[in-house]
Amino acid sequence: MKKWKQRGFAFVLALSLTTGMLTGAQAAVSKETLNEAVQDTAEYMYRTVQDPQVGSIGGEWAVLGLARSGYDVPDSYYQDYYATVEAYVKACDGKLHDKKYTEYSRVIVALSSIGKDARNVGGYDLTKPLGDYDKTIWQGLNGPIWALIALDSRDYPMPENPGAETQATRQMYIDRILECQLPDGGWSLFGGTSAASSGDGVSDPDITGMALQALAKYQDQPAVAKAT
């Protein structure tokens, strides 16, 4: 059952990110078939995740998938989730994780999908940690990838982080992704970084898809257009 849940979450997340980009000959299936699949999976997700918490499976990805799917979800579902996030953020004094800054990005994306401003959640600015370049990229390429996706999810300005050793900019995250592109054209979690091991020289479809999503907004930059 756990595998099916994970597949369902991943399916709706992928569809929620790509549905709006498929048109005409680009679509492998008809729009009606795609919409039916989205609705069926969203219904399953809604029935399965009745009380979303702060976390990956059963949390932000479920909220994002449902919000982007167009499925008819009661407003109270999102209101209760936001209240849960607010209580969680207050309980940990605004510090979601001391190492993995994708924790902030994931929550930001989910909040943006339901129309909430991540810059004031229980009095805490959840975008601020993403202003720390070194800490954001520490966990691998998913750090800068999701920082860009999160900040662009609501067109947040780049947050100032006085405590950062290196203040981040959007361009720095873009450049980080580009410089880590592998010879085969894709990306992997640690490929192109100092932490890379022998297996990181081969593209990972998951990370590659994330990288393309993060760079999609920046196609006006020649280096981005060439890389993608």
Protein language model features and the residues they cover:
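Intrinsically disordered, low-complexity N-terminal segments that are enriched in acidic
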Residues: 32, 48, 86-93
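Bacterial N-terminal signal peptides
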Residues: 12-20
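Alpha-helical repeat scaffolds
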Residues: 76-89, 120-134, 162-170
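An alpha-helical repeat/solenoid feature that recognizes helix-turn-helix modules
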Residues: 48-74, 95-119, 136-170, 175, ...
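Short N-terminal segments immediately surrounding and downstream of signal-peptide cleavage
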Residues: 29-45
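Sec-dependent signal peptide cleavage junction
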Residues: 19-33
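Bacterial N-terminal signal peptides that target proteins for export
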Residues: 1-11
